[in-house]
Amino acid sequence: QFELTLLDWAEAHKGARQYVAFADKCWPAFPEQFGFEPCYVNSRLASRGIPVACEVDIYGALSEYIGACISEDAVTLLDINNSVPAAMFEKAIKGKFDYELTDTFMGFHCGNTPSCKMCADRAVKYQLIQNRLLENGGTPDITRGTLEGDIAPGEITFYRLQCDSDGVLRSYIAQGEVLPVPTCSFGGIGVFAIKEMGRFYRHVLIEKRYPHHGAVAFGHY
């Protein structure tokens, strides 16, 4: 019903425009009001070429839309600020791939990545953190609705368009890959690697005051 409502709303409000994108409000308000998480529906829309950004990230939605146009494929939006554990790097990455620990990070979001960009064991589950916050860690009810699993390995392009506090549009773009390394975690998640990511994170993402969301196109563009 939620998916059909969004599609109907888009059709009714796009006017003469051909394409649409959404920037939805999700946690914590959505599950408490509607009784489920919107992530899986968001992933289905993204699979259809209708990008959906989490947490009312308008420029994230615009970034996704740009990637969808360029790649002519499904895209996603992920947190870019989660580290790969040193023990995981030592065990599964070091010596097997040409990356340093600081080149790697966990690309993560609750469960909005299209199923076509995830590994075969993906499944609809529940949001672990919100279950702890909203349901005291009990049997999941209103926190169900995430699409969880590891993101499929392959080439990616990470990018974002953003307006700064002076009203100036800025952007970044970086090419890398999702490594074939099990994350052993929850959500829609993957072990990402971008050469010199540590320097890029410090001197571009932080110094230029970019948000922690990055759009992902699957391939090098």
For the regions a protein language model found, what residue spans apply to each?
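Anaerobic metallocofactor- and corrinoid-dependent redox/one-carbon enzyme cores
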Residues: 2-221
